[in-house]
Amino acid sequence: MADDLGDEWWENQPAAASSPEQSGGEEGGDTEMTQQDTAPVPEKTQQPTECFLTQTKEPKAEDSRKTRKWKKKKISDILAKSEPKPGTPEDLQKLIRDHYSSSRSVIELEELHLPDSCFLKANDLTHSLSSYLKEICPKWVKLRKTHNEKKSVLMLILCSSAVRALELIRSLTAFKGDAKVMKLFAKHIKVQEQVKLLEKRVIHLGVGTPGRIKELVKQDGLHLNPLKFLVFDWNWRDQKLRRMMDIPEIRKEVFELLDMGVFSLCKSDSLKLGLF
């Protein structure tokens, strides 16, 4: 008993078996560590890349205007699909109604309606200028000989530009005979020079633009009462395929000229209108 008590009792005592709970816990911990060490590291799953739709820039106001302008029908495209039609008196009547509809009453519009008797036969696109004038004015030689009034002409031909006026004057050779022809446009010619020329000479035929003719009438350099024929260069088209009445500036000046006494002369049957 004494010997047993003398020994270091804690040294001789066998190591106590670990409790199942402790051993189990430690083994489980080792297993977990082993699994964590040996298990392959899962590859990082690629996050789905966000897909950004590229937004088309909204067209600016200028771009939209250009697009609309580009889509607008051109006169050349319209003419390519249809044959050109010669101008008629009704075309002029319609332009008169459209021009004055916003500024005149219904009664005033009726007064502006031109009688059919004031219209000469329109060009059917088969005539030259000389042949057309011979047809509508067969007594030109007689009229020319009896005309002796200054500051006036027997016939006016309205066109859209000075270049076109020169072309028409060159094509008058077969018709005019000994008649005196005057250029009535603004290019390189001052109004006062034309006024002085009309005061000095007897002119039978004038070819020019409505703007300059209107200015001569306004300055009392040209009287319209002796006028017998007013011919519109109606069917000719410029490089942009525009007729003279398709050009807003020219159309405006034509109506301003008509307001200077042409309507009343047509109704009195002393003035005839022709569409060449």
Swiss-Prot record:
Keywords: Methylation, Phosphoprotein. The modification Omega-N-methylarginine is found at R164. InterPro entries: Cms1, P-loop_NTPase. It comes from Mus musculus (Mouse). The modification Phosphothreonine is found at T209. Residues 13-23 have a biased composition (Low complexity). Belongs to the CMS1 family. This is Protein CMSS1.
